[in-house]
Amino acid sequence: MSDVTHFSKVVAATASTLVSGDLSQSHVMRDISRPAFQKRIFSFSKRPSELVRITSSSKDVLLPDEMLVDIPSNENQFSLFQGFQATLPEHSVGSQLLLGDGSKVGEKSAREQLVEGKKSLSHKLDLLEVRKALAANEITEIDARVAHLQSMRQIVFDRVASLEQQEFQLESEVLRIDAELEQMEEEKEEVIQRHDYETRTPEELEDDVVDLKSVSEKLQSASQKTLPRRNLSRRKTQPTLQQYYEPGNKIRQIKAHSDSVTCLDFDIPFGTMVSAGMDLGLKVWDLSRGDLVTDLKGHNASVTCLQVDNNVLATGSADATIRVWNLDQVVSNPDAQDEGDDAYTIHVLDSHVGEISAIHFSDHTLVSGSADKTIRQWDLNTGRCVQTLDVIWANSAQNALYSNDRLRTGFDANAPFIGAVQCRDAALATGTADGIVRLWDLRSGQVQRTLQGHTAAVTCLQFDDVHLATGSRDRSVRIWDLRMGNIFDAFAYDSPITSLDFDNRRIASTNGENTVKIYDRAAEKHWSLGRGEGDPEAPESTVVKTKEGYLVEGGGDGVVGVWAC
């Protein structure tokens, strides 16, 4: 009996502890303290039964305030049961009448039928309202999820941008160290060669026939600045951030010049950009930050054309000179120019006697076109002109060409005589003021093929392995098949084409309007981007360059816009 007594005391103590505080119920405590309950405890081992009979109603069940704190507010005007009813399938009234007793229909008066019909329609209307509210709630939930995903995407997007910025910085440092190591190796070889020559005995000098002039030239060339090596495969990282922008979105805007932008180019997306303007400025920019690196000095007039190829910059100016710059030195030591204007200059090419209107270089060959009606080929290793191509037909047509402002063919006599050039290996393509595109062989200096179709001056061109794209003042862009020599595709805009750039996916061009024209080559679709899309009063776009879905355009107000395309 002592064990049973001990058990009853433990049960009573435990029960009093569990139901104490806010969760206590007075009638349960009264039942436990009654003698009848104690008697049932003693007989529990022989006749198991319910210790406490719950006789309380729902009105007696109370919830403490602590359990009601986190209940959300009911913003829905419909009950849970109404929502359940709205999800049940409907049965048409007509089918119910047909399935029921048809004799009862006639017994009802017309008024009763109308009242029942109204009730049925009202019920359906209520169900539709509930369903509409449920659908609206789903839309709200989806919008909230989309907003949350967008915020998460922005966080990851910023993380990718930060990682790419760190990659660019480390990559630039690696390339700078590689360039210094290569320079040290070259200097070491030069020292060894000088030492070997200076330590030769008089007998060795007498035995060998030495050309003093050639030795002097070698020593002089060794002391000159050399063209840095350009190898794109050296870059271990490639930018990808531009792929995550929607086409047509603005990435950045830079107030680059105080006057119209005449030309620009960049190496890679978010890399290094060089721009020139009518304000005589020639500036180097960090596209990842939008910061000015330095302002290059050297030309005595505005820069009319330029090209950036990895770590080399070539600029052509209205002062009839071409300058070749080392961009590695510009980026690594932007203050070196304070010591002199030639701190970054590799070569100054000054054989032309007229304004430089077009340049292009590939590997160690640079080709330039000038207002002096000549095309010159340069060796970038030595900085010397190795060939001059004279456009003979221009001399005979000069009087007719400039006798009035506009010819019968429709092109403007004020257009550059040589509007565009591009070279690759021994191939050269030129576009001139007569609207003809000529394909040259640099080995022979002869024209191999002419492409005729434009009716005004050719202002820009670019070719790859298969196609050549040309833009003209006749407002058209033509794509030529280099294998067959005929037109592959053509389209026109409302104004003369001023610049053009293309890749396998799209052709971007400017035509004096305030937007950049994009032609999707795969979808054969035209669309536009630029400040003019949202502002009809925006200034015109003067020049465009694009690479891998990353587009940079210069405006007539000196602003450079960076866009995703």
UniProtKB/Swiss-Prot annotation:
<comment type="function">
    <text>Involved in mitochondrial fission. Acts as an adapter protein required to form mitochondrial fission complexes. Formation of these complexes is required to promote constriction and fission of the mitochondrial compartment at a late step in mitochondrial division.</text>
</comment>
<dbReference type="InterPro" id="IPR015943">
    <property type="entry name" value="WD40/YVTN_repeat-like_dom_sf"/>
</dbReference>
<dbReference type="GO" id="GO:0005741">
    <property type="term" value="C:mitochondrial outer membrane"/>
</dbReference>
<keyword id="KW-0472">Membrane</keyword>
<comment type="similarity">
    <text>Belongs to the WD repeat MDV1/CAF4 family.</text>
</comment>
<dbReference type="InterPro" id="IPR001680">
    <property type="entry name" value="WD40_rpt"/>
</dbReference>
<keyword id="KW-0175">Coiled coil</keyword>
<feature type="repeat" description="WD 1">
    <location>
        <begin position="256"/>
        <end position="295"/>
    </location>
</feature>
<feature type="repeat" description="WD 5">
    <location>
        <begin position="453"/>
        <end position="492"/>
    </location>
</feature>
<dbReference type="InterPro" id="IPR019775">
    <property type="entry name" value="WD40_repeat_CS"/>
</dbReference>
<dbReference type="Pfam" id="PF00400">
    <property type="entry name" value="WD40"/>
</dbReference>
<keyword id="KW-0496">Mitochondrion</keyword>
<dbReference type="GO" id="GO:0000266">
    <property type="term" value="P:mitochondrial fission"/>
</dbReference>
<feature type="repeat" description="WD 3">
    <location>
        <begin position="351"/>
        <end position="390"/>
    </location>
</feature>
<feature type="repeat" description="WD 6">
    <location>
        <begin position="494"/>
        <end position="529"/>
    </location>
</feature>
<feature type="coiled-coil region">
    <location>
        <begin position="119"/>
        <end position="224"/>
    </location>
</feature>
<dbReference type="GO" id="GO:0005739">
    <property type="term" value="C:mitochondrion"/>
</dbReference>
<feature type="repeat" description="WD 7">
    <location>
        <begin position="534"/>
        <end position="565"/>
    </location>
</feature>
<keyword id="KW-0677">Repeat</keyword>
<protein>
    <recommendedName>
        <fullName>Mitochondrial division protein 1</fullName>
    </recommendedName>
</protein>
<feature type="repeat" description="WD 4">
    <location>
        <begin position="401"/>
        <end position="452"/>
    </location>
</feature>
<feature type="repeat" description="WD 2">
    <location>
        <begin position="298"/>
        <end position="335"/>
    </location>
</feature>
<keyword id="KW-1000">Mitochondrion outer membrane</keyword>
<keyword id="KW-0853">WD repeat</keyword>
<dbReference type="GO" id="GO:0016559">
    <property type="term" value="P:peroxisome fission"/>
</dbReference>
<dbReference type="InterPro" id="IPR020472">
    <property type="entry name" value="G-protein_beta_WD-40_rep"/>
</dbReference>
<dbReference type="InterPro" id="IPR036322">
    <property type="entry name" value="WD40_repeat_dom_sf"/>
</dbReference>
<dbReference type="GO" id="GO:1990234">
    <property type="term" value="C:transferase complex"/>
</dbReference>
